[in-house]
Amino acid sequence: MTQRRSLTITSLGIAQTLAWASSYYLPAMLATSMARDLGISAPTVFLGFSLALVVSALLGPLAGQLIDRYGGRPVLAANSFIFAAGLAGLALAQGPLGMMIAWAVLGVAMAAGLYEAAFAALVHLYGKDARGAITGITLFAGFASTVGWPLSAWLELE
């Protein structure tokens, strides 16, 4: 394996770990606190998360088209800003509407930044030789809950 390929796998693996931890696994740790702070029920927080999943599913094909057209690097890099905007929106939400908008933004980020997009980028980059890279990234991101849950719990205390 070349040094460049190792760097790509490591970088995408870390990015995937953070993306999963800060999106998919986020409500598992923070839904109760979010609900309390926003004056809503925990199921309403999970409704917002469900909205993110629907948005992600609807925009997934578009994310794939963008990766096919422009390559994975610009799409995944730009998507980091969308993730940041969605997370900032959640942090700044003052009520259910703001929270729902933030979850919708996170849904956009999830469409263009989770496994499907990363794997499409690797296939675009390595073609038939992408299998090993995909496996490596999956192994990295498998630690998302291991990293995300304790980190979220710690951040919640701060």
What are the residue ranges of the model-derived segments?
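Extracytoplasmic
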Residues: 7-42, 59-63, 148-152
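Intracellular juxtamembrane helix-capping segments at the cytosolic ends
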Residues: 34, 112-126
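Glycine-rich segments within core transmembrane alpha-helices of 12-TM secondary carriers
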Residues: 129-149
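Short hydrophobic/small-residue motifs within alpha-helical transmembrane segments
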Residues: 50-57, 142-144
